[in-house]
């Protein structure tokens, strides 16, 4: 699709979103066609909810988030087939794999293990592997990435190339508030089992999160080497584990010192060469 066509599509969706109270399941014509076209482009990976510039800054294409939100108004509830034992679900969003056969899967080039769930408008790149997991609408999963068992990729989340999302990992989805950016895991990251990255936080390229690390917008990210505290973004090639920080001079009602509070701790930083040659377990040893 040309830049002119994309601009026209964006204009139609922006206008429809501004008038969304009048968009419903009976809406036909230009608005429905535009939303369907946007979802198809997302599904095929031809557009993304967020794109990374040469300077490392991420730009959010809000109109694509608006297209996803409008689809909930346009689509009625319907039976979704494909459950075990010929069971069904009841939802507004069909499976990405609806109507797929061998040719579709071979052309797509990724592995989809039984019981993985991918909703329409999510993109899965070639050589990705989906264990029994959940990938929500509008998400992007990059080439060669492993989404391990019971991991969740939230709505519009952006997962880079050659990422490993370990068992039970949660990558948060962000559709609303509209101005919020999606949660982003850049290329070559490892996210340890049962960790959570949410609320539009960014894990930069080559970083390693140990098991059970939780990062939201209000989570303190502490660099152990410098004492620097930051929020919302893990720097490139950081090795991060769960930790805690003293509450300073704060006390409880009984006069005793207040408990320590959770934080994420950057225990070391490695260069690209070291990261590529060193095993994950070795990196996480203190």
UniProtKB/Swiss-Prot annotation:
Annotated pathway: Amino-acid biosynthesis; L-lysine biosynthesis via DAP pathway; LL-2,6-diaminopimelate from (S)-tetrahydrodipicolinate (succinylase route): step 1/3
Pfam families noted in UniProt: Hexapep_2, THDPS_N_2
Documented EC number(s): 2.3.1.117
Family matches, as InterPro entries: DapD_Trfase_Hexpep_rpt_fam, Hexapep, Hexapep_transf_CS, THP_succinylTrfase_dom1, THP_succinylTrfase_N_sf, Trimer_LpxA-like_sf
Localization, UniProt: Cytoplasm
Keywords tagged on the record: Acyltransferase, Amino-acid biosynthesis, Cytoplasm, Diaminopimelate biosynthesis, Lysine biosynthesis, Repeat, Transferase
Secretion signal, residue range per the UniProt entry: none
Gene3D superfamilies referenced in this protein's UniProt entry, alphabetically: Hexapeptide repeat proteins, Tetrahydrodipicolinate-N-succinyltransferase, N-terminal domain
Any one Gene Ontology molecular-function term assigned to this protein's record: 2,3,4,5-tetrahydropyridine-2,6-dicarboxylate N-succinyltransferase activity
GO cellular component labels: cytoplasm
SUPFAM superfamilies (UniProt xref): Trimeric LpxA-like enzymes
Gene Ontology BP, a term: lysine biosynthetic process via diaminopimelate
Catalytic activity: (S)-2,3,4,5-tetrahydrodipicolinate + succinyl-CoA + H2O = (S)-2-succinylamino-6-oxoheptanedioate + CoA
PROSITE patterns to which the protein is assigned, alphabetical: HEXAPEP_TRANSFERASES (PS00101)
Stated family: Belongs to the transferase hexapeptide repeat family.
Protein name: 2,3,4,5-tetrahydropyridine-2,6-dicarboxylate N-succinyltransferase
Species whose genome carries this gene: Rhizobium leguminosarum bv. trifolii (strain WSM2304)
Gene, per the UniProt record: dapD
């Amino acid at each position: 699709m040309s830049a002119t066509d994309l601009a026209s599509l964006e204009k139609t969706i922006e206008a429809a979103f501004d008038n969304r109270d009048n968009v419903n399941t009976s809406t036909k014509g230009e608005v429905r066609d535009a939303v369907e076209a946007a979802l198809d482009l997302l599904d095929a990976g031809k557009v993304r909810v967020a794109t990374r510039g040469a300077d490392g800054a991420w730009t959010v294409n809000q109109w694509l988030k608006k297209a996803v939100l409008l689809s909930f108004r346009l689509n009625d509830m319907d039976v979704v087939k494909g459950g075990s034992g010929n069971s069904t679900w009841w939802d507004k969003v069909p499976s990405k794999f609806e109507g797929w056969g061998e040719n579709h899967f071979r052309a797509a080039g990724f592995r989809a293990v039984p019981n993985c769930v991918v909703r329409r408008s999510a993109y899965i790149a070639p050589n990705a592997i989906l264990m029994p997991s959940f990938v929500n609408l509008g998400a992007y999963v990059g080439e060669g990435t492993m989404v391990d068992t019971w991991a969740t990729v939230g709505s519009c989340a952006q997962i880079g190339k050659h990422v490993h999302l370990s068992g039970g990992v949660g990558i948060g989805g962000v559709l609303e508030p509209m101005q919020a950016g999606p949660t982003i895991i850049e290329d070559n990251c490892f996210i340890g089992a049962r960790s959570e990255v949410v609320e539009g936080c960014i894990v930069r390229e080559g970083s390693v999160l140990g098991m059970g690390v939780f990062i939201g917008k209000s989570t303190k990210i502490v660099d152990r080497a410098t004492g620097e505290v930051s929020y919302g973004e893990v720097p490139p090639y950081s090795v991060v584990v769960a930790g805690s920080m003293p509450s300073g001079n704060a006390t409880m009602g009984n006069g005793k010192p207040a408990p320590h509070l959770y934080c994420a701790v950057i225990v070391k930083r490695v260069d690209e060469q070291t990261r590529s040659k060193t095993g994950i377990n070795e990196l996480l040893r203190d």
